Amino acid sequence: MAETKDQQNEVNIIIISDAAGDTAFSNATAAAAEFPKAQINYRRYPFITNKDKLDEVLEEIEKYPNLVIIYSLVKDEMQMPVIKFAREHNIQCVDIFSPVVEAIKQTTHMTPDQKIGAQHSLNQKYFDRISAMEFAVMYDDGKDPKGFLEADVVLLGVSRTSKTPLSLFLANKNLKVANLPLVPETHIPKEIYEIDPKKIIGLTNDPSVLNEIRRQRMIAYGLNPDTTYSNMDSINKELESAQALYKKLGCYVINVAHRSIEETAALILEHLGIDDYAK
């Protein structure tokens, strides 16, 4: 039976790793973004550290059509069965780990350790990052004002100005971040006025962009999009109120309209004089 067009466009990307598989998954999603019309299914198999587990994976994936295998396996004896399986089944197979290791080996004339998960060794920087992530969750949306005094960065902004995703992104850079949603005529915690203005980032947005984002959010929840929340007059009032607060605080202001989380975060890091806090 001939494949339908949908079946031809379907790709099952198999990700096999002896660690978490995040690197392989990131590479896969970045590459898949080049094929918007393809139906991409991701099937992740992390922590495959022995041949018995690997044999089970290879047996399971045999049932899927249109396979592409992406693997990140440190040890040669784990790589060979995958390569053999792919060759026997005429499957595209990509090793994202070995070429880089080989390039470094050839340049340095050193022998690799073949230590699984070496890039994720539990050093102090790792624990600091976990602590920063926990801090961001604990002090999201102004849950506890004391977090503002302990934070490296405090994000202020009206609803839908990317406060939470920015907090988590910066936390991954080892920064302790707290954020506060701004609503007109609501009390601003006194702690906001007690911290260094340089640590405060005021987030704003274009009214039309904010209107569209909020309307789409209401639609996604199955609600009427034409409410006070998405009303242009209300949005303008919110933004003007926020802008007045930023001026009073003397803080750095960023318009997040048409900016990715990464771009906004880069501006914040530059403002703080941090090149790469995650190093």
Swiss-Prot record:
- Show the Pfam families listed in the entry: Kinase-PPPase
Q: Which reaction does it catalyse?
A: N(tele)-phospho-L-histidyl/L-threonyl-[pyruvate, phosphate dikinase] + ADP = N(tele)-phospho-L-histidyl/O-phospho-L-threonyl-[pyruvate, phosphate dikinase] + AMP + H(+); N(tele)-phospho-L-histidyl/O-phospho-L-threonyl-[pyruvate, phosphate dikinase] + phosphate + H(+) = N(tele)-phospho-L-histidyl/L-threonyl-[pyruvate, phosphate dikinase] + diphosphate
For whether the record's keyword set contains Cell inner membrane, the answer is: no
| Amino-acid positions noted as binding ADP in the UniProt annotation, renumbered to this chain | 157-164
Does the record bear Hydrolase in its keywords? no
Question: Which InterPro entries does the annotation name?
Answer: Kinase-pyrophosphorylase (IPR005177), P-loop_NTPase (IPR027417), PPDK_reg (IPR026565)
Q: Name one GO molecular function term.
A: ADP binding
Domain of life of the native organism: Bacteria
- EC no.? 2.7.11.32, 2.7.4.27
Keyword terms of this UniProt record: Kinase, Nucleotide-binding, Serine/threonine-protein kinase, Transferase
Family stated for the protein in its record: Belongs to the pyruvate, phosphate/water dikinase regulatory protein family. PDRP subfamily.
Q: Which HAMAP family match?
A: PDRP (MF_00921)
Purpose: Bifunctional serine/threonine kinase and phosphorylase involved in the regulation of the pyruvate, phosphate dikinase (PPDK) by catalyzing its phosphorylation/dephosphorylation.
Q: What is this protein called?
A: Putative pyruvate, phosphate dikinase regulatory protein
> Which organism does this sequence originate in?
Lactobacillus helveticus (strain DPC 4571)
| Phylogenetic classification of the source organism | Bacteria, Bacillati, Bacillota, Bacilli, Lactobacillales
